[in-house]
Swiss-Prot record:
Residues 113-139 are annotated as: Disordered. Belongs to the PsaD family. This is Photosystem I reaction center subunit II. Residues 116-130 have a biased composition (Polar residues). PsaD can form complexes with ferredoxin and ferredoxin-oxidoreductase in photosystem I (PS I) reaction center. Gene3D superfamilies: Photosystem I PsaD, reaction center subunit II.
Amino acid sequence: MTTLTGQPPLYGGSTGGLLSAADTEEKYAITWTSPKEQVFEMPTAGAAVMREGENLVYFARKEQCLALAAQQLRPRKINDYKIYRIFPDGETVLIHPKDGVFPEKVNKGREAVNSVPRSIGQNPNPSQLKFTGKKPYDP
């Protein structure tokens, strides 16, 4: 079981209604390290001040964690965030990045999906492929 560490940002509002559903179902947490104290917008409305060092925020939905990461952390060049699912029994599971490397980064051993081994300039003309049974995305 993973123990999450970090301090919550300075925030005067709510985190989108964890309420009692999080105790009976699941909740999500996002952790990141900030190089300095700075203001950011919460995905559940309002603004908060992330603290220098490790930060930890709980949300009711995974999408709220992803929104915070994509819209607030990445533009600030904070790329060490991790998203966890926390079950009612206390079990914590890392859900993003699943294998420790973000999806858009190259990871040795990760197979390319929907990859065509050519540049855009080498794509065939679709009008020449019409009625041949070949698709423009075929290698």
